[in-house]
Structures are given as C-alpha cells and as structure tokens.
Amino acid sequence: MSNKVKSDIEIASKAEILPVTTIAEHLGLDADALELYGKYKAKLSYDTIHSLKDKEPGKLVLVTAINPTPAGEGKSTVTVGLGDALSKKDKKTVIALREPSLGPTMGIKGGATGGGYAQVIPMEDINLHFTGDFHAITAANNALSAFIDNHMQQGNDLEIDGRRIVWKRVVDLNDRALRKVVVGLGGPIQGVPREDGFDITVASEIMAIICLASDLKDLKKRLSEIVIGYNYKKEPITVGEMGYEGALTLLLKDALKPNLVQTLEHTPAIVHGGPFANIAHGCNSVSATSTALRLGDYVVTEAGFGADLGAEKFLDIKVPALGKAPDCVVIVATIRALKMHGGALKTELSEENVDALAKGFTNLQKHTESIQTFGIPYVVAINKFITDSDAEVAKLEALCEEHGIPFSLTEVWEKGGDGGLELADKVIAAVESGAADYKRIYDDAWSMEEKLEAIVTKVYGGIGVELSSKAQKQIVEFKKYGWDRYPICMAKTQYSLSDDPTLLGRPTDFVIHIREFIPKLGAGFVVALTGDVMTMPGLPKKPAALNMDVDENGNAQGLF
C-alpha cells in the first residue's frame, strides 16, 4: 500500500465491487431471493427471510467500545475489519450494521460505513439515500403527525389535548431551528394552532420499531401501540385508537426488509436500520441480525457508542427480541480516547502522553467488568491510529496483561482484514470455548426503580438514582397503566459513565439524575431522560458538507 494516507472515498472508489447477486451466491441465495436496487444493493425478500426462520443460528459477536471522543473510536471500522478477518479464517461470515443518518454525515461524521481499508461499499450510496429506508420512516412519522392534526381539525372525537401531544415531526438532518415550532397558524381553515417540534429521523420511535419488529404482523402491532399524546382527561391515546396502524404499515412494508451489500473484501454485509444510541437502543434491526445469523456461521454486529449505552441496551432490550445472545463481545479501545479519560486535552490527543493513558485505563477496566456482569467472554480490540506512539502501545498492552484483560492490537483501518487476524483468532477461541452464559441485569417484572438501580450500579458504576418530582409522579402513573413492566432505555451522554459529559475516566460515588420518562410502547421500552439529551442535533460551525461535492461524471467527493 502507498504511504500516502488516502481518504475513505478514494479507497472505496478504487475498490473492485462485485454484483450483489454474486455476494448473495456466497450465502447460498439465488437472484430470486433479492429485490435489486441497481447492481450493488438489494433488499432480501420476505419469502427469503421466512424460508430461513427454522435454520439454526450461527455465532454472534457484538462489537462495542469504551466511552468515545466526539470523533468516535472506529467501532464500525473494527466490525468490518473483524468480519473480513473471520472470512480470511474460512469462517462463513456476515456483518450486520446500522444505516448512517444524513444529519451526522453532513454535520460532523462525513460518513459512517467504516474507514480506511475496512469499509462497506458502495459507501457513497449507503451514506446518502441508500434504499430509501430512512425516507420511508420519515414519511410514516410525518404522516402520523398529519393524521393527528387532521383529527383535531375534523371534530376531535378522541378529545386530543393539543397541549399534551408528544408525537413530533422528523427530518433526517441536523437542523436546530426546527427543535421548537408552532403549527396550524393562519386561521380556522389552516388547522388547530399548537406547539410542535422536529426530531432527527433516527430518534423517531418508528425507527426503533422497525429495528425491533420481527415481521409485518409484529410491525403493525407495535405501530398500533404508539402513544401519540393524551386527552383532556390526561389519558393516553394510541395510534390503534386513531386507526392508522394499517396505513403506517403500508408506508413501511419495504423499509422493514434488510439490505444486502458487501465490504471492500467482499464479505456480505446486511445494513439495516439506525436508531439513536442515546435516546433509543442504538442497534441495527432484529430482522437484519436474525437473517444474518441464519445465513452465516459467524455474525459480527455493533451497538452504538460505548458499552454503557449501546451494549447494555443490546443485551437488555435487543437480545430478548432477537432470541439470541452474543457468544463474544469485542470492546474497542483507542489510545487517544484513553488519554482523554486520563486528563489529556482534546486538542492534544495526537501527542504522546503515557501518563494520561495510564490514568484513563480505568475507563476500559470498568467496561470489561460490565460485560462480565452479563456473563459473556470478551476481547479488547486496541484500534491502532497512526498517531499512536510505540511507547503508548507498549504501555497499554502491558496494562492489559497486568490486569488479565485479553486484547489484540488491531490495524484493520490500514490493512483491512489482514490487520485483524489476531483479533479473529482470539474471538474464535472465545466463541468456541462455550463460556458465554448470558444473563440480563434485571427482570421485566422488577419495578422501574429497581431496573434503574441495576443499570446505574452494575453498568455505570454509580451509587444510585435521583428522580425529579416529575419522574416520581410518572412512575405512579406508569404503574397504573402497566407500563412499568417494560425495559428501561437510558438516555444519557455517551462521553461519560455518569450523566455529566465532563466527568471522564472511571468516576465513583455519582448519582444518575432522571428528569422524566417517555413511554415508547411501540418500541417496547420506557426512555429515562438524564441531563440534556438532544433529539435534534445542530450543525457545527464548519459542517462536513462544506467539503462535499460531485464531479461532472457524478462521482461523489468529500465523504470520509
């Protein structure tokens, strides 16, 4: 390879890409199993998905991470690279990833299909409109908003209280100006004026529903259970009471089908869904993972942000819906993130600082302990960056050895699957050991307070929970409706184990502050809001979009 550092899109644009029908053949599927979106993308048909249901599932590997820096730690890159490495080890491997959101792509990320020589392709298609899943979800979400406003305009038989509508409109962009809006202005024929707002599409409950629904029947049932707001008696109103679950299911019937693409090294990749990892559960769809498990001997998937958010939700929310727990967990750690947790300034993360690295190591330790709480073996993937010094790498390896933490120095960004062969060996050994003995950290029958305590004490390392007066009243209300039986989906900062984004490393003696709960009954969980969690991001001063363009031949530029 050239010593010149190439951008992701430069690498992807020069890659040999096989017809998606050829990728399907690797999985034992013929062309009739696919619904083609051009030569290189396809959806798997419902007939195909149904035909696989009785097959024995393969082995599942979950990739998570330590608490990240704002730029991320390369979790998707390691997921792709590990998948390619397992393929090189003659394991029939399928990767299951989330779809990127246009908002972060145009904002700060510039793309989210892995990086370097560990990417999913066609990367520009996946990063932009792909097969239209997010647009369908946006349309369904906003159709529901239109149905709500129309119901109020046309007599309001359900006595919807416009002040207590909790359903928001969405758009798949970072647009802070839309966080709070007023709709229905302009006189009686324009609708009933009320306050409204926009979330980003990946924060929509419909996104979470798509990612947890097992089939069309389950999708329709979940859509009917969405709480859109409350009536004048403060009683909840659902989509089912309004009668629109059928129309919403119709809008989403194709979006529920998983998408098949490939990596740079032609490992099959099923890329589908993409809920926020802070406000929702942050995992790709149950349909995608379940299908992948029946097509491959090994499936590598990821969960959003760090193990405190993404992995906990994968294990406590997605696994019960999937019916299959991971056989091994890979925890991605980077030297730059550990230095940040050890007190190094964000502007100095590229500079050698062995002392900060050693101090920040406690963050990694906590995440390894949390995964062990779930009874699953793990391997730490040290995702090597070109700015890491030899002294820093040696120090981190020594710390892992000293504390009995299994690890592998991983260089998939630079070397593709070849850079993850040792990691693949250690993952295979962990999987084949049969050591996985999965257990959730709480039971659905527990009280909401008990579930919160379990997450905070066992996963975050805190000492307890403090409920606002609003949250306390909501718990009483939720018990009345039976909503306390749902799993808890914590909405908190990804940067810290606590709810304070400035409290880095491994904080102790902290309390998690719950300000309110949001029932997401269609998704099947209750969101617990901590701190200031944003459901509609804003753009940075210099968005990644400033560097994006397209040449006269239609080739994308600036995605990275």
Swiss-Prot record:
Superkingdom to which the source organism belongs: Bacteria
InterPro entries noted in UniProt: Formate_THF_ligase, Formate_THF_ligase_CS, P-loop_NTPase
Entries under Gene3D superfamilies matching the protein: Domain 2, N(10)-formyltetrahydrofolate synthetase, Formyltetrahydrofolate synthetase, domain 3, P-loop containing nucleotide triphosphate hydrolases
Pfam families registered for this protein in UniProt: FTHFS
A GO molecular function held by the record: formate-tetrahydrofolate ligase activity
Reactions performed catalytically: (6S)-5,6,7,8-tetrahydrofolate + formate + ATP = (6R)-10-formyltetrahydrofolate + ADP + phosphate
Single GO biological process annotation from the record: tetrahydrofolate interconversion
Coiled-coil positions: none
Annotated EC: 6.3.4.3
Associated pathway: One-carbon metabolism; tetrahydrofolate interconversion
Binding site for ATP: T69, P70, A71, G72, E73, G74, K75, S76
Keywords: ATP-binding, Ligase, Nucleotide-binding, One-carbon metabolism
Family, similarity comment: Belongs to the formate--tetrahydrofolate ligase family.
HAMAP family: FTHFS
Protein known as: Formate--tetrahydrofolate ligase
Gene that this polypeptide is encoded by: fhs
